[in-house]
Every structure is written in structure tokens, then in C-alpha cells.
Amino acid sequence: MLYVFVKFREGKNPTPSKTTHNVMIEVLWTVIPCIILIVIAVPSFKLLYKEETIPKADVTLKAIGYQWYWGYEYPDEKIAFESVMIEDKDLKPGQPRLLATDTKIVVPVNKVVKVLITSADVNHAWAVPAFGVKRDAIKGRINETWFKVEKEGIYYGQCSELCGIKHAFMPIEVHVVSEDKYASWLIEAKKKFAMEENNSSRKVKKILNKEKM
């Protein structure tokens, strides 16, 4: 911009050029960007392919979006439960508002977790920013993603697809723990959240959730 101001100032160019087009320049500014885009595209396609390729999973988790909470299943362990946001009046010290849930996802550290994502009603999106994960939850379709967390801790996410009046009240809470703690949790979870026993309770919770609307 400064170069143009100096180069084509009135003092140096009392009679301005009236050139309307230049074929060579037009060809160059069309061809050169195309070449650059092609060069960038080759490694980009490789990265996109790798991004969609899921490594062999150590843990498989299924996330089902409902209006307005998440349901989870560990199909290999026959575990199923719902995860509902804790209301303000029920929060305990240290629990973040609009993010804490009554039942948490638990996964082991340094393990590949494959997530199968779907919906039971409208479109939702399962997103945990710290994992770099966001996938749409669509009824009748299963989308896949994965993550591998290298640090123990509590990670939060939310539904990222506008899904109704309580869209903002669909948090995701993931506890990443050691393998020993995960094994202990599995023992308790298999007793508390056995998939067959949870079918009726899940239907009841759905009904109650709708009645609160």
C-alpha cells in the first residue's frame, strides 16, 4: 500500500495510466494462487485422512443425545447410564455451574477412547474442547471420533448444536483417572449401571425430563 502511494503519487505521475487490464498479470494472479492451493492440498488431504482414522480403541463409549441430557453406554462392559446437569441449588462446593453432572464419564489415562455418537431425537453435538473433539449427534446415524488424554483430571464440554430451549443445560463431564481407579470404577459401575437393569429407569427419566418442560 505504501509502495503504491509513493510509486503512483501525483507528483511523479501527472498523467495517470489509463490501462484497464493486463493479460499477463491477470494470468499470473490466477495461476499462482491455484498452484499454491494445490501444493497445500496434498498434505492437507493426508492430514484429513489421518484425522478420520481411529486407532485401535482401548475403551469404547457410546454417547446418545436427548432433549436435554446425555445418555452413555460402555458396550464392551454392558454399562449404561444418563448424565444430567446438576441444578444450581444442588451444587456442591467446587462444582462448576452449568457444567457439573450427576453421573460422570470415567476413562483411563493414556488410553485410546473411541466415541460413538448418535441422537434419540433432534440434532445435538458432543464437544469437549480440551480433547479437540466435536461431532454431530444425529438420529439414525452413528458418528465416530476418538481421544487419548495424557493427563489425569476433570474435563468439561457441552452440547454444541442448538437443540431446543434447554440446549445450554447439556454439559459433558469426563473424569480421566489412572488404570487402577478405572478398574475399580468399572467394578462398581457394572453393579450400579448394568445395561439390562437400566432400560426401565432410562425410560422413566426421559418422561420426567419432558414433564419439566
Question: What are the language-model segments listed below?
Answer:
Residues L2-M213:
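Non-transmembrane, membrane-proximal soluble domains of secreted or membrane proteins
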